[in-house]
C-alpha cells in the first residue's frame, strides 16, 4: 500500500519523480478502469515534456484493465471534455499540470458526459485502488485496444456554433498561447475563419507549443505574465488581446489599450452576449464579486443565480437551474451546450462577436461597468487562525450589515459596498474581495479596514 500524494481535492497534481511517474500513471489507469469499468476512454496531453510518456503509461494501465483507448494527441483540457461528450464514450483523462511549475505534471479526470471526477465523485475511490495496487492479473484476451484519432475539425465546428461568423466585422486580434497547447487550435480557428471569409486578422505570439516554456510558465493571472500580450496589442494597434494558460481552460482578455480586464467584468460581458441570443435565460455566478453581474443580467432580462465557488458546484447548479452560462471571476467560464464544462476558446469568440455587434471597443464595453462597481481584486492573507479572524470581521460589521450570506465563506452587504471573505480549501489563507457602488476611495478604505482586522 503506497500513499499517493498526487491526488488533490479536484484533480491529480504532483512533483515529477516520487509523486508522479510512469508507474503511478499506469496504476491510475488500472484503477480508473477497475472503478468505472468503462468500455472506451479518450486521452490527451498538454505540451509538458513528460505528458506523452505519462499518457502512454496511463493508456497501458487502462488497456490492461480491458479498456479501449482513443488518443487525441496534444490537446487542451477542454478538447478532452469535447471528445468525451461528442463521441459519447465512457470517460476522458487529460494529462496536464496547467500553470504549475516545470517539475510538476498532473491529470484531470471525467466520466461519461464529461462529468468531473473529483474528491467526492470518484477520485477518492480511484486513489484507494491505485494505492492498494491489488489488481487482477491482466487477461491478454480481453486487453483493450489503442488508437490515435483527431477530432479537431469537429471541435472547431462546435466552437464556431456559439457565434454567427457573419456578425464579425474587421478585427485585429493578438493571441498569446504562452507556448502551451492553444497554438494549434488558434491556427485551426484562423484557417477556418479565413475560409469563411471573416475579416479577422490574427497576430500570434509564443504560438509554437514548447514544453520547455522559453517565455515562462503561461499563467496570465500573474501580472508579470501579461507584459508580452499588452505590448503586442499596443504595437499592432489591435482591437483585443487574448492570453491563455498552458491547457487553455482559461482565457484572459486585454482591451485595445493593452489593459488587462479582470475576469469579474468578463462574466457580465458574456452574460450579456448570451442574453442577446437567449432572452430570459439563467446565469450562474460565484459569490466573491456579484453586483456587476446581477445588474447586467437583470437589466438584460435574465435571472442571476449565485453558486458556491468551484467547478463542481457551478456545474451542478447549472444543471439543476438549466442555466445557459456560468462564470467565475477567476476566468473560468462554463457553457451548457459544452456539457456544462469550462472553455477558454468560447469566451473570446463571444466577446469578439459582441464588440462587432455593439460597434464598441472592448474598453468601451467594460469601462462603465468597472466604474459602476470598482473591485479590489482578490487579496490573499496567510493567517495562523483563519476562522477566528473571519469571526472578528463579522462581529465588527454585524450591526451595520444590511445582508449576510454564507453561500461560500462570509459575504456582508451594506448600502454602497460589500465584501466576501473565504478560507482556501487547500492552504491556511483567507481570500478577500471588496466592491462598491461607483466609489473607489470607499472600496479602498474598506479594504484597508478589513485587512487590518484580519491581521490583528
From Swiss-Prot:
Its EC number is 5.4.2.8. The active site is at 98 (phosphoserine intermediate). Belongs to the phosphohexose mutase family. It comes from the Bacteria. This is Phosphomannomutase. It comes from Salmonella typhimurium (strain LT2 / SGSC1412 / ATCC 700720). GO terms for molecular function: magnesium ion binding; phosphomannomutase activity. Mg(2+) binds at residues 98, 245, 247, 249. Binds 1 Mg(2+) ion per subunit. Keywords: Capsule biogenesis/degradation, Isomerase, Lipopolysaccharide biosynthesis, Magnesium, Metal-binding, Phosphoprotein. Its cofactor is Mg(2+). One of its GO terms (biological process) is lipopolysaccharide biosynthetic process.
